[in-house]
Amino acid sequence: MEWNGRKIILDNLREELSAYTVDIQDVVRSAILDGIELGSYIEECREYPWRLEQIRLLIKEDLKEEVGTDLSGAMLYKIRCLHREGHNIEGLKKLLASGMEDEYAEIALDWHSKGYELKGLKISWIPRHLLDIFEKGLMAKMDMREFNTGVAYDKEYLLALMRLQSDGKSCKLFVDGTWDLKVLQLIEAKAGNLRPNEWAELEKRLRKDMDLQQVSELINCCKQGMGLAWIGENDVYTAKHLGYIRKAFEKKLDWKKLVGAGKSLTEIEEAYNSMLTEKGRVLSGRLHKF
């Protein structure tokens, strides 16, 4: 075995490694007998002979390429046990990032053994209080990468995002975690059944400083089939203004006369009532003909 530019054999082992514990020397002795090169790991495992032993066994069992040797002895042992039990350990080296804490490495191993789709998922980024929810999502075959941002979401916030994704909606707008929870829950509850084109229009007009009533009216407009193309991307309408526009559409009035974010509410109310009165006159005139 090569170590520090010198050749270690059984005859000089104790002398060459006299600065190391007997435990380290015994592991090296076993490695020499197995024909395994452990020289590059001796110093880093000076205080951890059991880890050195696990590296030796990992190499002996031809698992080094799949797993790497950056993990703790405890994790290397668990991986060897998984392999011995017949689990597929392909891809573990990439999954178990260098320096990953044992807690996260253990979770990664558990999820891998359960067959969850983990490709592209950075498990060490998941806040501890969200690990159980992430597992539920993985179990349901959801794409949890969309929420793998490192943001410490409130649990209810993440659940609302997951329900949106389940409805086929992109959550990109909301994954920064800064939206009001009640607004997000309203969007998830009311907009989940919007068609793709309606959802795309709604996304363009949603702003995180909107209140519940404004967002609710925007969704109502979408559901009425009005679309939202008439709203400029930088325009902000009050909930009451949107409500008058929607009601005008429902009553088949010339609702586009009410469009314009700069119009005052008084102006909007007068225009709406005027159109309503005019429609009443027209209907009344038609009835008199009969």
Q: What do the PLM-derived regions correspond to, one by one?
A:
Residues 1-290:
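General marker for long, soluble alpha-helical cores
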